[in-house]
């Protein structure tokens, strides 16, 4: 009986901790800024081919979901998982990307070629950390992230996102940069595999002022590099 009671208490504590952690994580709605479909999906036994890809200024290559790659005849493909909700691990919380095998119509990412930027509003809260799922092709992308708070004050972070072919340092990766998806293949515009592995979706962590309510985020990119912005997630400060 005592052992059963102890196990029950442990389960209750674990569930409470998990629930508390989940309540602190916010998957931001960035639907208004999405402008590209770089992932081929499989819907009703039919491939919907990517239209604006991950490199070559959008016309080079794209990714496939695992089901799409298997349907395509690829053997043991290094493809994106069918479930676009990436599980939490030691480096990041759950991260929700915007592709789906049940959706053959809507855009999946925000792609920026050359100099440019995007701004999006978020649920006003105090945030400890923000996580941006990104890829940069044709070299690194140089970014400035501006945080606009409810009191109309701002703070900034200047960041460098490496090329999506680059391996991240193995001597305990920089805490602000980790893999979200690692060692991916890529496919041409006829869903022909052009490279079998070694490409990534990186996850960049930034830190707004946790004592202020954040209301919007502005990401500006300098001319070098081709940027694909996949998702944004926030971790509340309290």
Question: What is the role of each PLM region?
Answer:
Residues 1-21:
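Bacterial Sec-dependent N-terminal signal peptides
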Residues 19-238:
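N-terminal/edge-of-domain interface segments
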